[in-house]
Regions:
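Conserved structural position within tetratricopeptide repeats
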Residues: 35-38, 68-72
Length: 81
């Protein structure tokens, strides 16, 4: 949910999440990325973005888990934080 709307597009969730991440609104960004993961659990970029949001919130062990998940899905992903 974003506001009173239920978003069902991974692309829209990611776009909004990245915007919130840039604004420093990490809680909302995390929520949006987690919603995107519910729609596509096999996208390593979603796990990486979730890790970035968690790291920004100081939730380091959870962030590492997300980065590891991203790498397990795509071991060649040089962008995985």
């Amino acid at each position: 949910m974003f506001g009173c709307y239920k978003i069902k597009s991974v692309e829209t969730l990611v776009t909004l999440g990245k915007s919130k991440l840039e604004e420093g609104d990490f809680d909302v960004a995390l929520d949006l990325f987690q919603q995107a993961i519910l729609l596509d659990q096999k996208d390593p970029d979603l796990w990486n973005l979730t890790g970035i949001a968690l790291r920004s919130m100081g939730r380091y062990s959870e962030a590492v888990e997300c980065f590891n998940k991203s790498l397990s899905l795509d071991p060649r992903d040089k962008d995985s934080s």
